Curated annotation (Swiss-Prot):
This is DNA-directed RNA polymerase subunit beta'. Belongs to the RNA polymerase beta' chain family. RpoC1 subfamily. It comes from the Eukaryota. Keywords: Chloroplast, DNA-directed RNA polymerase, Magnesium, Metal-binding, Nucleotidyltransferase, Plastid, Transcription, Transferase, Zinc. One of its GO terms (cellular component) is DNA-directed RNA polymerase complex. Signal peptide: none annotated. Binds 1 Mg(2+) ion per subunit. Binds 1 Zn(2+) ion per subunit. It catalyses: RNA(n) + a ribonucleoside 5'-triphosphate = RNA(n+1) + diphosphate. It comes from Spinacia oleracea (Spinach). DNA-dependent RNA polymerase catalyzes the transcription of DNA into RNA using the four ribonucleoside triphosphates as substrates. SMART domains: RPOLA_N.
Length: 677
């Protein structure tokens, strides 16, 4: 439907029998009204044409082939000069065959049928409206018992029949025959009510606003009573108050949406368009039919039987009619929701029939599969793995995914650079994976962001923009800091990749959706890009160091001369001297050559402003040299001073892990400063 703002929208709810009839009924150009499905047949076994008034009738649902009627005559669609607009022999209109995707039919039920969703689903809407137990309503719907109608105080057939049960045995066989004569159902319906018709009558008699007033008054009265001191009674009162609140909310919803309660009981059963429940011919001439067709046939068979019992048979026992009404109710229940009342209906191969509920609900249902989430072009999907070397705003795309997503852009680049004469040649180069293809792909990806999405998308951080780069393998590489926004981890999670095509979408991705633009939670303002457990453990290992202390290895200013260019092992690690390094590169190079450990203490020459060294810490030791220079040794650094007490060099006691962390922080600060400037 289209609202007042011209927005397309879908609304699900109850509709009146008049609305169902308006959807399904159509008037042919000759004035004939069609739309009711009366026969349980699909296709004729000889001609393979739809049966008239059947589940695939062309008069009701439209022609199978555009502009061709059931007789085989052809008319041009949309030609105003063509007359008539339908075939006078078969009654099929000359219209587009796509009408069979939305043209509905209906089945006129011989008795009212309760919609099983409103009766059996929890909470039961019908039970809430009538304020009766669900088991009692089920017994009434499925004709297990009846209730007497309020009538005047006069002799009734119910009383008469009760008296006959105690009379002489000679009347035993004649009295039931009297109660099953033609026309007795009129007297029976005057005094008793059963089946879905009884539910419909009670729902039709309800005044919704009166229900709200009485429910609110009762809820207020229960609230004023207070606690009784009995735990069981208090729980009972609490459950009653919750029920009254749910009842008032339900009634308000019906009033707001202009839905009548009696619409929860069906008199007309809609028939889906045939293209939504097709019969397909496969190899070998075999036919495959949708399960819904079999369930519709079951409903029509039982409904026609009940119609015959009510109209043609003269001596039909009342119990037989009630039993047939129950069968019609069960057939409609199976069509709407197979298995909701217990054992589901199965076919000859012991396979459960898929009902209407099974078609639309679940992950593979109509809504989540094709309406809410559908497959789109320029998208891909793969497993995510950690990419610790990536920047926060970058992601790694596998070559297979990248070349498929950006194939049209690569083709345009090949043609513009005169590397391919046409699209076919460009596609051949891509299939053969020539080196120039990857070069152009990298150029295209540099200026084109991509969107990463992880289901379920519960908030706006569930889909963010990244700058893609090519990586080896078949998994998407992701920076670990952005995982919290996606609620993702690296234990097999999958993410979807989308390419924004329009300039507006690309601008929105760059300005609003880039990962480095979403560092704070939009809900509470807390940081969303925080280190994960893996990163915290890595930082701890990186900065833990060896805590032997400076006194464990007595200082010797010439220990750096004893540093050997050889690997170390655990046997001589404890007795090894602490080496001296002049810069970062020497220390990291020694670690990569496995001459020192990640947490090995070392002395590193530090270019530091002398004004920063203003600590009042007393040196642990002071060593003097023959030339007058001396070394002041502190807990984590040492200072070499001249004779005039001027600082010559400063060495800090650190580890390779601390050095690596410091360099990363320094590069990040420098990059941020350059970006801001």
């Amino acid at each position: 439907m289209i609202d007042q703002y011209k927005h397309q929208q879908l609304r699900i709810g109850s509709v009146s029998p008049q609305q169902i009839s308006a959807w399904a009924t159509k008037i042919l150009p000759n004035g004939e009204i069609v739309g009711e499905v009366t026969k349980p047949y699909t296709f004729h076994y000889k001609t393979n044409k739809p049966e008239k008034d059947g589940l695939f009738c062309e008069r009701i649902f439209g022609p199978i082939k555009s502009g061709i009627c059931a007789c085989g005559n052809y008319r041009v669609i949309g030609d105003e000069k063509e007359d008539p607009k339908f075939c006078e022999q078969c009654g099929v209109e000359f219209v587009d065959s796509r009408i069979r995707r939305y043209q509905m039919g209906y089945i006129k039920l011989a008795c009212p049928v309760t919609h099983v969703w409103y009766l059996k689903r929890l909470p039961s809407y019908i039970a809430n409206f009538l304020d009766k137990p669900l088991k009692e309503l089920e017994g009434l719907v499925y004709c297990d018992f009846s209730f007497a109608r309020p009538i005047a105080k006069k002799p009734t057939f119910l009383r008469l029949r009760g008296l006959f049960e105690y009379e002489i045995q000679s009347w035993k066989y004649s009295i039931p025959l009297f109660f099953t004569t033609q026309g007795f159902d009129t007297f029976r319906n005057r005094e008793i009510s059963t089946g879905a018709g009884a539910i419909r009558e009670q729902l039709a008699d309800l005044d919704l606003r009166t229900i709200i007033d009485y429910s609110f008054a009762e809820w207020k009265e229960l609230g004023e009573e207070g606690s009784t001191g009995n735990e069981w009674e208090d729980r009972k009162v609490g459950r009653r108050k919750d029920f009254l609140v749910r009842r008032m909310e339900l009634v308000k919803h019906f009033i707001r949406t202009n839905i009548e309660p009696e619409w929860m009981v069906l008199c007309l059963l809609p028939v889906l368009p045939p293209e939504l429940r097709p019969i397909i011919q496969i190899d070998g001439g075999k036919l495959m039919s949708s399960d819904i067709n079999e369930l519709y046939r079951r409903v029509i068979y039982r409904n026609n039987t009940l119609t015959d019992l009510l109209s043609t048979s003269r001596s039909t026992p009342g119990e037989l009619v009630m039993c047939q009404e129950k069968l019609v109710q069960e057939a409609v229940d199976t069509l709407l929701d197979n298995g909701i009342r217990g054992q589901p209906m199965r076919d000859g191969h012991n396979k459960v029939y898929k009902s209407f509920s099974d078609v639309i609900e679940g992950k593979e249902g109509r809504f989540r599969e094709t309406l809410l989430g559908k497959r789109v072009d320029y998208s891909g999907r793969s497993v995510i793995v950690v990419g610790p070397s990536l920047s926060l705003h970058r992601c790694g795309l596998p070559r297979e995914i990248a070349i498929e997503l950006f194939q049209t852009f690569v083709i345009r680049g090949l043609i513009r650079q005169h590397l391919a004469s046409n699209i076919g040649v460009a596609k051949r180069k891509i299939r053969e994976k020539e080196p120039i293809v990857w070069k152009i792909l990298q150029e295209v990806m540099q200026g084109h962001p991509v969107l990463l999405n992880r289901a379920p998308t519960l908030h706006r951080l569930g889909i963010q923009a990244f700058q893609p780069i090519l990586v080896e393998g078949r998994a998407i590489c992701l920076h670990p800091l952005v995982c919290k926004g996606f609620n993702a981890d690296f234990d097999g999670d999958q993410m979807a990749v989308h390419v924004p095509l329009s300039l507006e979408a690309q601008a929105e991705a760059r300005l609003l959706m880039f990962s480095h633009m979403n560092l704070l939670s939009p809900a509470i303002g807390d940081p969303i890009s925080v280190p994960t457990q893996d990163m915290l453990i890595g930082l701890y290992i990186l900065t833990s160091g060896n805590r032997r202390g400076i006194c464990a290895n007595r200082y010797n200013p010439w220990n750096h001369k004893t540093y050997q260019n050889e690997r170390i092992d655990d046997t001589n690690y404890k007795s090894m001297k602490e080496p001296f390094f002049c810069n970062f590169y020497d220390a990291i190079g020694a670690y990569r050559q496995k001459r020192i450990h990640l947490d090995s203490p070392l002395w590193l020459r530090w270019q530091l402003d002398q004004r920063i060294i203003a600590s009042k810490e007393a040196p642990i030791e002071v060593h003097y040299e023959s030339l007058g220079t001396y070394h002041e040794i502190y807990a984590h650094y040492l200072i070499i001073r001249s004779v005039k007490k001027e600082i010559i060099d400063i060495y800090i006691r650190t580890t390779v892990g601390h050095i690596s962390l410091y360099r990363e922080i320094e590069e990040a600060i420098q990059g941020f400063y350059q970006a801001c400037s």
